[in-house]
Amino acid sequence: MKPLLPERLLACLPTRRAPRLTALFVLTAIACWGEPGARGAASPSSPASAAVLPPDSNETDEPVLVPAAPPVPLPPAASPEAATTPPTSISRPSQAPAQLAPHVAPKLEAFSTWVKTHKGELSFALRDLGSGRELMSDGAGKALNPASNEKLITAAVALSELGPDFKFHVGVLGKLENGVAERLVIRGNGDPTFSYEELRGFAERLVALGLKRVAGDVLVDQSAFDDNYTPPAFEQQPGEWAAFRAPVSAVSLDRNSITLHVFPTQPGKLARVEFEPPGYVSVQGDVRTEKGKKRDHVGLTLKPHGLLLGAEVAGGIPEGDAVVHLTRRIENPEIYAGVVLKRILTTLGVVVVGDAKRGGEDEATELIGRDSVKLAELVQQLGKASDNFYAETLFKTLAAEKRGKPGSAQNAAQVELDWLKARQLGDDGLAISNGSGLYDANRVSARTFTRLLEAAYLDPIISHAYEDQLAIGGLDGTLRARFYALRGRRSVHAKTGTLNKVTALSGYVFGPEQETGVAFSILVSGISAHSEIRQRMDALVLEISDTLWAPHGSAALASR
């Protein structure tokens, strides 16, 4: 199916219960054409629209038509002060067409049979947003490992409990007199976006304020979170240095990761090796620039070196080759930002007498600081990009903000469980240990997810931000390469999930102009054939979309 509008213009169309295409709306969309960062466009620089991404990292009941069931109760409204605009009530869309379940049932039955044949488990639920009733189910109450679909819960609870306008803050504190600071303290409350470039900007601003000497230490105040930097279940893969397994801390830097850059020079000469940010990694070994080679073979081995990192590099890079970039997690973030800030200040000519250490909780005077973007924008890294680091940081932030500092994963899990229980969204077997869904940590049923999706849809405080953070089939995020035939409809808004033997997909399917809509959840456990599972999942969702988009109801469907 060809899109109704060019893809770049499609990216500008609103994602929520849109009005009909009036002349004013068309003019607005055309004006958006020239904006590379427009909402929904695939701009790699914007967290609101992730580029093409790989599947999430490391990452038998018969189908039945369910009789009428009571709608999910509306969630309690969050504080109006947390919203960017005054909240309004959210009306339910029109009820899904009566032929939806009968038309989808054969696809579901075939999928269920395939899962059973391959010794897997299935949890499936389909809920009508118009009536609030569960239309179809297959093991809907069975709690399975949800993989990154857990981020649907973390995003909803964060938006509800913290508010869409919530911002993180990072600052440098101390007392500066006559160019001398007795000490400097970096303090944060969990901002996952804080970068080396921003820290360097802080250092430059300190110099502009007149800083010439730090008589004591550069301290890092990590007190907003507890000292368990490794999220629950991450210990199941202890030797993994990939950045998706980064530790979580109140003060983080560059997502608590480092990047090796290898630049080719002349054949036979040593390649130039640099780590970013500088000053945290001690390096041994070398990489050679090679003549006549077609591919690089750069090796990087990391190991803890006290609170810092040691690195051993080896291998070669072809002459004239592109720069090699390897990003890896750090082990202990306790003083990471302090070590790097001290290094930057020294390069700027500031004398730092002391060392980088943890502490400074009693410092009250902020010299410089900055707020993050709003949570409504930041949370898109969970839905569209499936970012584990952002998810685990938000998870602990929930604990710190709602149960007091230091925030812990255990308290965060309880915040999420209490939130679900208060809204009667959970099923038996519900278990939450971490906020990202990585590893074998959580158990959630498809019915819980569809109830959650309905509750978020109807919540006037979080509804817009929650739907916006989901990937759109055929257009962006982890669904950019899936549902490509539906990109013109923009009908599938969902979250993917992948682990070794887990494949998940949960979200919304909307009819034309979102006049109808359903929440769905498909969880498959025990089968590692991800590609085939996704094809079968997508076929099921496509059938739902086609039914909602059929222009003349059952007569049109019967003629297909």
Write out the residue ranges for each language-model feature.
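Small-residue-rich helix-loop
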Residues: 135-137, 395-560
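A short glycine/serine-rich beta->alpha loop
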Residues: 139-144, 327, 436-439
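Conserved serine DD-peptidase/penicillin-binding transpeptidase domain
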Residues: 35-39, 43-54, 59-115, 160-427, ...
